[in-house]
């Protein structure tokens, strides 16, 4: 326990908060060929690999994922939400932050219904999260 005098001289140092989605906090200047500090809510990228992963211990499934090379030249693993998808290699996608708890190393989600990613077919509820248009009556 520090004394009052020690606290007056040094003070408390607050811990720096680490980002949950670091790839969204970096930009890339292609003229200078160096990284910049530009935060973004989403980023565009190109799929380099599309496949399935198996989740951690208590769960069992084949979760769809895509390896994405972002516009800032970083490569990340992103989860493809919803049932069925039309993504393949060289598809242009939009990613947002948000991890998948039972897939280690997956810190991003692909936004359905944006760029080359189609919305989920036949979805009636929670459509906005899956990029599905309103059904015709």
UniProtKB/Swiss-Prot annotation:
Keywords annotated in UniProt: Ribonucleoprotein, Ribosomal protein, RNA-binding, rRNA-binding, tRNA-binding
Q: Where in this protein does the record put region Disordered?
A: 1-43
Q: Which Pfam families match?
A: Ribosom_S12_S23
What InterPro entries does its record include?
NA-bd_OB-fold, Ribosomal_uS12, Ribosomal_uS12_bac
HAMAP family referenced in this protein's UniProt entry, alphabetically:
Ribosomal_uS12_B
Summarize the protein's role. Answer: With S4 and S5 plays an important role in translational accuracy.
Q: Which NCBIfam families match?
A: rpsL_bact
Among PANTHER family, the record links this protein to:
30S RIBOSOMAL PROTEIN S12 FAMILY MEMBER (PTHR11652)
Full protein name:
Small ribosomal subunit protein uS12
């Amino acid at each position: 326990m520090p004394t009052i005098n020690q606290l007056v001289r040094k003070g408390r140092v607050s811990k720096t908060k680490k980002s949950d989605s670091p790839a969204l906090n970096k930009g890339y200047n292609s003229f200078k060929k160096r990284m910049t500090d530009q935060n973004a809510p989403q980023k565009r990228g190109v799929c380099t690999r599309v496949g399935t992963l198996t989740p951690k211990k208590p769960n069992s499934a084949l979760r769809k994922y895509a390896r994405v090379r972002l516009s800032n030249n970083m490569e990340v693993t992103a989860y493809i939400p919803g049932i069925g998808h039309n993504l393949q290699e060289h598809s242009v996608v939009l990613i947002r932050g948000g991890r998948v708890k039972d897939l280690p190393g997956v810190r991003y989600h692909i936004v359905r219904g944006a760029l080359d990613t189609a919305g989920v077919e036949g979805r009636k509820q929670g459509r906005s999260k899956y990029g599905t248009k309103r059904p015709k009556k």
